[in-house]
């Protein structure tokens, strides 16, 4: 009946001349409005709503808006007509780009006793759920859409199940648990358990397929048993068409390449425990290669249906400049150009992702003015500029920025950062002008710094953080990127890092997590940077069968060892990391 509203405003606003619209409207619509003039109360209201429905069906949105704004509603009016009144107002608001106004109409106190078994009730709840999705409120969308699924016709083309599944994939485990605790509905509980089963096996498509089969045997009366969301339906095809011959191009004689190789192999053997149907892997060493194309073509002509690598940025630039590649390729670094090739995917440990995470975290915590403290070199200068750009685009301000060299005098650097040196200069000038020499000087730091963005290794951090405290800056929050953490349990040494908030990968912050084990159990101890490269190797293996899923949009993210991985329109993968803070020398997770 109201199928024209299902999208709830996917079209752009309609501009029309109101006078000509009134004159050209079909006689039945004008007749309804004429009849309504002769009536009052509920009877007039019902006729006007019927006329407005026809206006919207005809695409006459401007007149529909004009007419509906002149209507008064009361809770004593016919419930069905009242729901249409709210739904039509929400539709018009969404068409006009007013999503907040739309949800206010759909959440109106008059919107009570919505019968999901009725066509109007289903349309109303679907519009409401989709509006929540538009407003990035997945929890509310889940609660709303789950009311509808058991009543939804099997032959409808509407993507209700996909909408609900997308919302389920946009909440974390903790949010799912909260929803589950409040749920008394078999339908909603079933959806939650399906999401949990699917998410718990993200490391393996085969294990996900087994988990879905087990869920279907358990939740036999659930609507999704007969109608799985499309991404889950497609999973069997993804498994059957996965790459079976992988060429791995890495500088295995170099520490970075070897660490990635170790991580890749650990994930490979972890998958072997699940299924014997693992891909064939051939290694191509790029340690002494000056140009990648000869080695790349050798790997491609060797029968590979997927190439993972190369690692060197200049090699990735070569591949991008080549244009269309003969084989799907997952490069392990990022090209300088934002351009893309159809079958070139780019994945790595970009520090820009880490900086974005720190900036988001600081902003969410209410900070607006930053000071920057990082090493002095060309590479770090680029990162400093990226942080400044990211922070100022948010509306933040940079109070000061200081660069340091390894082994520098951190006292002078910190005094410069918080303007203690300026306070000392003013004191010296004042003392030189006054005759008395028994004046007591108390240095003061600048008081407009909300937080300090620090880029440093653990050794430098252990000197800088206490120095900040010595110069009256102990209460200024300090945020950092993964370089501040070496990844080992060392409370005595790390005590000097206490209070620093930083972001890092799950591999580093959740070493006992089921997603990482047994992958890391068989690996020797290594430094923090090499551990993160191992995690990258793990994720390169776990990503390899899912590239087309990402490319088609069937999945939008994957919880990996390096973070929550997503992809952009240029087939470049980005990571969302986790936050932690040093407490008593221990890197302690900050749960969101």
Could you describe each region identified by the protein language model?
Residues 8-26:
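Bacterial Sec signal peptide processing site at the extreme N-terminus
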Residues 25-232:
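Alpha-helical protein-protein interaction scaffolds
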Residues 85, 256-259, 274-337:
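Beta-alpha junction/loop-to-helix N-cap segments that form part of ligand/metal-binding clefts
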Residues 300-312, 330-332, 369-375, 424-458, ...:
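Periplasmic-binding protein-like
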Residues 337-361, 494-506:
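Short beta-strand elements at the ligand-binding edges of bilobed clamshell
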Residues 347-406:
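An alpha-beta-alpha
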Residues 424-427, 447-449, 465-538:
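Extracellular/periplasmic periplasmic-binding protein-like sensory domains
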Residues 521-589:
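Segments of small-molecule ligand-sensing domains
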